[in-house]
A protein has these predicted regions:
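Short, flexible, basic/aromatic active-site loop/helix in glycosyltransferases
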Residues: 132-155
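Short aromatic/hydrophobic "clamp" motif used to bind/position activated sugar donors
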Residues: 83
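A conserved acidic beta->alpha catalytic loop
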Residues: 23, 38-47, 63, 93
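Cell-envelope/extracellular polymer assembly enzymes that use nucleotide-activated donors
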Residues: 3-5, 33
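Conserved donor NDP-sugar-binding/catalytic core segment of glycosyltransferases
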Residues: 93-127
């Protein structure tokens, strides 16, 4: 049984998909399967994946039903201990996947983890930060929206 199954959903942008898959395959832990779900890209994305990354399982969809539908199509077949959903513009740093898996193994009460997102120049992407859900956080968010300060709810 796989320890990790990685799912990357694509719609075009073969350049980004190639960089994503290259970074994943450089860092891939043992017992990992990589799936690419192509959402009926209008370009040669699926063909590029098939030609350049034969070790990846390619799923070709006949329509673009969105990110969630494409992920769910593969998630129903996942038999691994863990699943990782990646956007195609993601690049994985060496050692990150092993670090995430070790963290999950050491914390069996945790059901999901996320990573810090940084821009191409290494700056933390504050727009991707989310707070822990709570009544206070929700109240603060909506109060800030009333005064037009939604950006500060992510800092």
């Amino acid at each position: 049984m796989d320890r990790l199954q990685i799912i990357v959903v694509t719609y075009g942008r073969p350049d980004l998909v190639a960089r994503c898959l290259s970074s994943v395959l450089r860092s891939i832990p043992e017992k990992t399967t990589v799936h690419v779900v192509d959402n009926n890209s209008p370009d040669d994305t699926a063909e590029m994946v098939a030609a350049r990354f034969p070790e990846v399982t390619l799923h070709r969809r006949t329509s673009n039903d969105g990110f969630a539908v494409a992920n769910n199509a593969v998630l129903t077949e996942v038999t691994a201990e863990y699943a990782l959903l990646l956007n195609p513009d993601t690049e994985i740093e060496p050692g990150l996947l092993d670090h995430l898996l070790d963290g999950m193994d050491e914390n069996p009460d945790v059901g999901m983890v996320g990573c810090r997102l940084v821009t191409a120049d290494g700056i933390l992407d504050h727009a991707a930060k989310r707070r822990i859900p709570s009544p206070w956080a929700a109240l603060r968010y909506f109060a800030l929206r009333l005064v037009g300060r939604t950006g500060s709810s992510y800092t």
